[in-house]
Amino acid sequence: MLDTGTEQRTIEGSALRLIDAVLGQWASQGSSAMSARSLAIEAGVPVSSIYHHFGSLEHLYLAAQSHARAHAQRWCEDQLSQLDAVGPLSPAAFPTLLAALIDDWAENGRRMAFAWRECILAAAREPRFAVEIEAWRAIWTRFWGAVCDRCDRSGYGDLTALLFYNESLFHLIRWRRVIDRAALQDLCDGWSRWLAGELADEGPSRAAARTEAARTMPSLPVLGELSGRIAQAAAAVLQRDGLLGLTHRAVAAEASLTLGVVSHHVRTSADLVRAAFEMVYRTVAGGGATAPQPVRRTDAELVEVLVAFQNDAAPLRALDELLLAAARDPSLSGFVPQLRYLRGRTSALLL
């Protein structure tokens, strides 16, 4: 490290530019499309700067996670400060506040939101990121506990943090802004009623969005035994390598088929994504079962079950890949209403 103040500031500046490049590319394309070269070009520094400042690309990613969490913590503090300015709120204010906070995070905290999601995906492949996930979880547990306390919903912070885990991801996907925001409000209204021990209906905006999603469901190429085998392989590649790794060659290798066979049955990259979507959706939806079953658990037991489910459910990680890709890539807009509004057992477990 250099001694003079000017040189020290230059080093810090280039390191921060690299961190900013990581955050920008997490939001625009995801880790699977990133490289040391692309980050160095965006930051305007030589590739060697990554290794000079951070020692490795992985350590740069970890530094970017720490930076993102610091910004997320400031976002939380700002929201709580605004709440403190008006004093305690009644439980009736809770659903509107919950929807407003999720919406603000997805819009104004968008880069940090993508960083958090990339951390979750990275932990499935790199155990070192598991510690980072726990640091994120601690931020949200504290924040939602404080929000619930201010709305006379004390004791529901852990459960609401889990709802936020789910809905903040779905709300990153932009379909019809007005409908998306209204549907989010419907869900938060239902959540508040559920916490009060009441039945939670779907809500008019959410029901309308779900109906449209079902009506416009794309035709999906999973027809016969061979097509199903290809779709299973596509879902496995998606889970392991991300959307960038979802190629005809990778799927052929995963399915133990020739490239020619896969290319004949699934002709385009878009068809390959559709095949993976079909298999992941069927797995997560549980064969179409949508009616929620009664949950006979204490709140603490339910939190434990849901956290374990998030950590261990491989199909959900593949779905997360699709959700994040749809949030970034306009070419996947044909799947957006289905990804946002057609859900299976995962949501039924909560509502």
Annotate each language-model stretch with its function:
Residues E7, A130, E134, V147-A208, ...:
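Hydrophobic/aromatic-rich alpha-helical bundle segments in the mid-to-C-terminal region
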Residues S14-V22, L39, A64, A68, ...:
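Generic hydrophobic, amphipathic alpha-helix propensity
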Residues A27-A63, V237-D271, A275:
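Helix-turn-helix
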Residues M34, A72, M112-A122, I133, ...:
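Short, structured motif recognition centered on aromatic/hydrophobic residues
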Residues R74-R110, T160, G288-L316:
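Hydrophobic alpha-helical connector segments
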Residues D84, A99-E107, W116-R125, W191-L195, ...:
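Helix-loop "lid/cap" segments that line or gate small-molecule binding pockets
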Residues N108-R117, A124-R150, D312-D320, P330-L351:
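Amphipathic alpha-helical packing segments from all-alpha helical-bundle domains
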Residues A122, R150, Q232-Q239, R249, ...:
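Long compositionally biased, domain-poor regions of proteins
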